[in-house]
Amino acid sequence: MSVGFIGAGQLACALARGFTAAGILSAHKIIASSPEMDLPTVSALRKMGVNLTRSNKETVRHSDVLFLAVKPHIIPFILDEIGADVQARHIVVSCAAGVTISSVEKKLMAFQPAPKVIRCMTNTPVLVREGATVYATGTHALVEDGQLLEQLMSSVGFCTEVEEDLIDAVTGLSGSGPAYAFMALDALADGGVKMGLPRRLAVRLGAQALLGAAKMLLDSEQHPGQLKDNVCSPGGATIHALHFLESGGFRSLLINAVEASCIRTRELQSMADQEKISPAALKKTLLDRVKLESPTVTTLTPTSSGKLLTRSPVPGGKKD
């Protein structure tokens, strides 16, 4: 099995690192495409030994499981570009927020009668094999296809199948959740520094507190409210701190954050359905539609041993 990523950004980098660290895939079995080869994430993928190309079509040809790891509004243009190269063997996995299975299937069915499509939502902690992933299978995807994706994603954290109409809410909760946690941790560390702690120690203590709390919750069957109560002594420091958080609307802010992320996810789907995208974004993403300033394109070609090597064709294209 080989895995391809259309897009070589943070998500592709995190998944590739997670898959290789888990031992479920070797780096030479992974390929990623990006129109820009000087990105930090591309450099990280290169150091891992992942195959890299500027051609999205090349990525499709050399993969069995294909992750669409680009911005939601770019998905329709990607599908138009690679549709003719998608074959019956491919499992097309959309990781883009808000992009529905039906919209991907509709595009691909112009080229292939029964495309196997899976929609998933994951998060960046897959990098350290502590991700949270849900997925929903499309009309033509087999049970075995879903099981294969679950095997992949379970190697980098928690993974479960859900109904598709729940995925937007998942995006607002666990998809965006790490950012909420990082912001909270940054603020906690600031509080520690304000009260005299060195920054490095404050960050470490805050991170360990969040990590420990999460592990306690996952390892127990207790409600988070009960675990919270267990920390609060009558008249103690913690209950006074919680009162301060409550008076500032702490719970409501988190609820509203999840809701805002979910609503924005649905707006992104609307943009994707209308195929709205700026010319600049299109130029950055689609190599085959918009010529890059440099006519040299790095592609991958199989050798007689089955390995993939990079090659650069002789420049011959004209600039627009």
Swiss-Prot record:
Entry superkingdom: Eukaryota
PTM annotation (Phosphoserine): residues: 304
Major site of localization recorded for this protein: cytoplasm
Top class in the EC scheme: oxidoreductase
Region (Disordered): 298-320
Molecular-function annotations in GO: pyrroline-5-carboxylate reductase activity
Keywords of this entry: Acetylation, Amino-acid biosynthesis, Cytoplasm, Mitochondrion, NADP, Oxidoreductase, Phosphoprotein, Proline biosynthesis
Chain residues that bind NADP(+): 6-11, 34, 56, 69-72, 95-97
Gene Ontology cellular component annotations, sorted alphabetically: mitochondrion
Family, as annotated: Belongs to the pyrroline-5-carboxylate reductase family.
Subunit structure: Homodecamer; composed of 5 homodimers. Interacts with LTO1.
Protein name (database record): Pyrroline-5-carboxylate reductase 2
Taxonomic placement: Eukaryota, Metazoa, Chordata, Craniata, Vertebrata
